[in-house]
C-alpha cells in the first residue's frame, strides 16, 4: 500500500514512517516543517513540503500519488500555548482536518488513522480511562482534537470515510538505533527536558505543581514508547484495510508514573543528579491520565514492547547523548 503520513517529519510521525517502511509499505510524507525536521524523514519516503490547510497542495500530491490510506499527525499540540491562543489550534488542527477530509473525499481516499489525544477526556472521573468515558476537554488543544473526531464521524456517515482515532497519552523514547528521536522547539515534554538537563544542554528542571491529589503531589501520566505507538498506527491501518468499522482506541501502557518518579528513573538511567525545582500548576493540566488499552489489545492485537519506564528513558537518553543539539537544524 501507499500510505501518506501527514506530519511525517515530526516526532511520532518520523518514527511511524520508519516502521511503515520496515513493514514493506510505500510511504509519502507531507509536512510544512513548522515544527518538523526534514532530517528526521527517512530518505526512502517521498517528501512533499506544504500545509494540510492548503487544498491546492493536497490536490497536487493526491493527483501525483495513488494514496491507499492516510496517517494524520499534522497538528499543534502544546497545551499552555492552546490556552493562550485557542484560535491558532482550531484553525490548524480542526480546520486542517476539514480541508483534508474534503481532499480525501474528492480523490476517493477512504481510510485515515488519526492522532487524537487523552486530552479529549479532560479531568477523568475514573482511572484507567476507557474509550466510552465522557470526553470533556479542559483545554483548547483537547477540544480541537475532539472536534476533529466528531467531524470524522459525520464524514464517515455521509461519505463512508473510515477512520481510527488513536487517543494516546505521554509519548517518550526514541528509535532504539538512535537514528531519530525527540527534538521540539521549544521543548515542553518532561522526559526530553530532564535528559537535556542531564546532558548539560539545559540549566534546570521545573516541575509544575506538587499539590495534585496524587501519591507524591505531582502529575501522574501514562507513558508509551514512540515505536510502540508507531506500531499501533500500522495495526490500525490493517484494521481498516480488513473492512472494519470506524472506531477509537486508547494507546497507553496502563501504568501511571508521577513526574517525580520519571525524574528519579532518569537519574538512575543517566547517573546524573539532575537538579529540579517545584513551580506552580500549569493551566489546563489534569492531575492523572492513565489509559485502559484493553480494547486496542483485544481488537488490534496491540501490545507494547516497552512497558518499563527505565527502558523507555534508556532509548531517549541514547538519542540525547549522541545528538545534544537534536537534528541541529534550528537556530
Swiss-Prot record:
InterPro entries: Epimerase_deHydtase, NAD(P)-bd_dom_sf, UDP_G4E. It is an enzyme of class 5 (isomerase). Its EC number is 5.1.3.2. Pathway: Carbohydrate metabolism; galactose metabolism. The keyword NAD applies. The active site is at residue 141. CDD domains: UDP_G4E_1_SDR_e. The keyword NAD applies. It catalyses: UDP-alpha-D-glucose = UDP-alpha-D-galactose. Its cofactor is NAD(+). GO terms for biological process: galactose catabolic process via UDP-galactose, Leloir pathway. Pfam families: Epimerase. Belongs to the NAD(P)-dependent epimerase/dehydratase family. PANTHER family: UDP-ARABINOSE 4-EPIMERASE 1 (PTHR43725:SF53), UDP-GLUCOSE 4-EPIMERASE (PTHR43725). Homodimer. This is UDP-glucose 4-epimerase.
Amino acid at each position: 500500500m501507499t500510505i501518506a503520513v501527514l506530519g511525517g517529519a515530526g516526532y511520532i510521525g518520523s518514527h511511524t514512517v520508519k516502521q511503515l517502511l520496515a513493514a514493506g509499505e510505500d510511504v509519502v510524507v507531507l509536512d510544512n516543517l513548522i515544527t518538523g525536521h526534514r532530517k528526521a524523514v527517512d530518505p526512502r519516503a517521498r517528501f512533499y513540503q506544504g500545509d494540510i490547510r492548503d487544498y491546492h497542495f493536497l490536490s497536487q500530491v493526491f493527483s501525483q500519488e495513488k494514496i491507499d490510506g492516510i496517517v494524520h499527525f499534522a497538528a499543534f499540540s502544546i497545551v499552555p500555548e492552546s490556552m493562550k491562543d485557542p484560535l491558532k489550534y482550531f484553525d490548524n488542527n480542526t480546520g486542517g482536518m476539514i480541508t483534508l477530509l474534503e481532499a480525501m473525499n474528492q480523490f476517493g481516499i477512504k481510510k485515515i488513522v488519526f492522532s487524537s489525544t487523552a486530552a479529549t477526556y479532560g479531568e477523568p472521573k475514573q482511572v484507567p480511562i476507557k474509550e466510552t468515558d465522557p470526553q470533556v476537554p479542559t483545554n483548547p488543544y483537547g477540544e480541537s482534537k475532539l472536534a476533529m473526531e466528531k467531524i470524522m464521524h459525520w464524514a464517515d456517515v455521509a461519505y463512508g470515510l473510515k477512520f481510527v482515532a488513536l487517543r494516546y497519552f505521554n509519548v517518550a523514547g526514541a528509535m532504539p538505533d538512535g537514528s531519530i528521536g525527540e527534538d521540539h522547539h521549544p521543548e515542553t515534554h518532561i522526559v526530553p527536558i530532564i535528559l537535556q538537563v542531564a546532558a548539560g544542554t539545559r540549566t534546570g528542571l521545573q516541575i509544575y505543581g506538587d499539590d495534585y491529589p496524587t501519591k507524591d503531589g505531582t502529575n501522574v501520566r501514562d507513558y508509551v514508547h514512540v515505536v510502540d505507538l508507531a506500531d499501533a498506527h500500522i495495526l490500525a491501518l490493517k484494521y481498516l484495510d480488513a473492512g472494519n468499522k470506524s472506531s477509537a482506541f486508547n494507546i497507553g501502557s496502563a501504568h501511571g508514573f508521577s513526574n517525580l518518579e520519571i525524574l528519579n528513573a532518569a537519574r538512575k538511567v543517566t547517573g546524573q543528579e539532575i537538579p529540579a525545582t517545584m513551580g506552580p500548576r500549569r493551566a489546563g493540566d489534569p492531575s492523572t491520565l492513565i489509559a485502559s488499552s484493553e480494547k486496542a489489545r483485544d481488537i488490534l492485537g496491540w501490545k507494547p514492547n516497552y512497558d518499563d519506564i527505565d527502558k523507555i528513558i534508556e532509548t531517549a537518553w541514547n538519542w540525547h547523548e549522541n545528538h545534544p543539539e537534536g537534528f541541529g537544524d534550528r537556530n
